[in-house]
């Protein structure tokens, strides 16, 4: 097969492949290798609408303490009072979906899981809101309270993809296709060393290639290559291939020190929609994966200073001033307040135009 043909060759993906990569499908199969998690399923329709609505509306309750609403809730003399006190605005402003009013059971269930597990990191069926870490002061997906979960999910383009575009490239998607049953996954938080996470491309039941997951340079990784490959081979061949229904898939594995076990972080479809990282899909498609063939574990070999200067995921999703503000908790708090002001101003102007 010529390289020109391979570049144009299709890599079809089916609806069942997407379904098989949903967290709840594979979690029970590999539970002992996955960080402790809780799955809430099904989700109320109001919660899905809440994630899809414009803006971010956090629950306002005098009985719930929150870093993100406490100042507003405990004082009547704040920036929002001018809008809230306007009679015209009060009668015509539609507040949208609000957690405490529209899905209180789910709200309380999330709070209970945080009490049980401690800090958590959220995701929907397939994606975690890693592109929205700029909105939290800690610049991670670590959530200590329910409002942080709402902020991450509402600000993430990855979550929008899960809700609206997960099956877009499926060759067997038919007219009248019904939406999947969405799920909220809350995984117990633990700090992952990004240098030790790897993306593994499994083709026809064999490891075809492995890429460093974090695209920064770590000088100690190269001498550990054989150790990583031995652990990856054993885990994929003994645990994943016998239990996962698709023989071609992409999985993210974490191998922490002292390098004696493997954590399963995620499973993705063997599809061009999955980021090949240090490879190209042309390379992967043309690899002839055989039992006796040694594959490449590809690493960053030199220090990419430009990569260190930017935050992963965020540079393509939010303005630079927002990313810069995320480095300062006070600035991001001010930004959130200004955002709310602008939304209220927009609602007021719309109401005035309709009169």
UniProtKB/Swiss-Prot annotation:
One of its GO terms (cellular component) is cytoplasm. Regulates the cell cycle in a nutrient dependent manner. InterPro entries: CDC123 (IPR009772). The keyword Glycosyltransferase does not apply. GO terms for biological process: cell division; eukaryotic translation initiation factor 2 complex assembly. Transmembrane segments: none annotated. Pfam families: D123. The gene is CDC123. This is Cell division cycle protein 123. GO terms for molecular function: ATP binding; magnesium ion binding; protein folding chaperone. It is found in: Cytoplasm. Keywords: Cell cycle, Cell division, Cytoplasm. Belongs to the CDC123 family. Disulfide bonds: none annotated.
